Amino acid sequence: MDTSTLKIRLETARSSFQNLELQLADPDVASDPKRLETIARERARLEPLVLDYEKLLEIEEELLEVKDVLRESKSDKDLEELAQDEMRKLELFKTNLINQLTLALLPKDPRDERSVMLEIRAGAGGDEACIWAGDLARMYERYGQKIGWSVRPISSTDADLGGFRELIISVKGDSVFSQLKFEAGVHRVQRVPATESQGRVHTSTATVAVMPEADPVEVQLDPGDLEISTARSGGAGGQNVNKVETAVDLLHKPTGIRVFCTQERSQLQNRERAMEILRAKLLEMEIAEANAKERSARLAQVGTGDRSEKIRTYNYKDNRTTDHRLGINFPLENVLEGELDNLIGACIAEEQRLMIEELGEQSEN
């Protein structure tokens, strides 16, 4: 994005900010709590951007003054040197501020602030794929714990030799989707399985779907589209095990999506949880369909969010994790321990770079 385009957008933001301040002073707005909250929230969102823009304008004024000093100080070498030093500092500050403002103006995903449900499914590779699905679940659990998110399983189908055929994890916290959305896709592992007696390297896969939580208003469910049945599930222990029908089997007839919930202690809780999962799955389908239509070929390079996209290979022999979208390797052991900051940060940076490129081309046209 060139500087002139950036300034046009920043002037628009400043004008909107000033208009919002006038509205906040309006008695009619003050007497309408809902409208007041909406305007105050939008003003708070724009304020840091406007303050940084005003800083940029101040720096540009200072640069003009320093250039005047330089023109007038040809006969005074000490003053000229001081002015040149000051100009270098201001130019660096200006460059950093322009970069910061450019990032702040990039389109935001409205779902970035949400909590998510992670669905991990064993893919190709039989028992080893199920074990690998369990390893991925532990990786995300460790990452969430480091950040301070709440991470808990809400639905699972265990495998005979360990791991899971399918697992859904609830991850709650601030801006979870903004971090984990880059994890959607096929995760491939190359290693010697614990079940392998000949020491041969096997390749197995697991798929990860990242589903932002959907509220009942956003994704409405028609009761006529649902088929709900119950089953016996392990209770609190002792005499209750397999005697109380607390498990819920939910089928969404139009899509064929089936959700089986057993993790909660009561049938009502499992029913509510199954509804939450179904809404998240339907929202994921809607997002994937929109991305396929609207996401440009350039931005698709850093991921489409589709669960069938091959995004990463974990190679145990070489202690290497390769992200195929970035073409970058990361230490395997660190990644599996949940140290995903560098990897996810690289994905975010690449997406931002591609978005800036795209905005630049749009402004030229």
Curated annotation (Swiss-Prot):
Subcellular locations according to the entry: Cytoplasm
Post-translational modification: Methylated by PrmC. Methylation increases the termination efficiency of RF1.
Record's keyword annotation contains Transmembrane: no
Gene3D superfamilies from the UniProt entry: 3.30.160.20, 3.30.70.1660, 6.10.140.1950
Entry's Gene Ontology cellular component terms: cytoplasm
InterPro entries named among the record's database cross-references: PCRF, Pep_chain_release_fac_I, Pep_chain_release_fac_I_sf, Prokaryotic/Mito_RF, RF-1
GO molecular function, one term: translation release factor activity, codon specific
Domain of life according to the entry: Bacteria
Residue numbers carrying N5-methylglutamine: 239
Alphabetically ordered keywords of this record: Cytoplasm, Methylation, Protein biosynthesis
Protein biosynthesis in keyword set: yes
PROSITE patterns xref list: RF_PROK_I
One Pfam family linked to the record: PCRF
Family from the record: Belongs to the prokaryotic/mitochondrial release factor family.
Alphabetized NCBIfam families for the sequence: prfA (TIGR00019), PRK00591.1 (NF001859)
Function description: Peptide chain release factor 1 directs the termination of translation in response to the peptide chain termination codons UAG and UAA.
Listed PANTHER family: LD18447P, PEPTIDE CHAIN RELEASE FACTOR APG3, CHLOROPLASTIC
UniProt-recorded name of the protein: Peptide chain release factor 1
Natural source organism: Prochlorococcus marinus (strain MIT 9211)
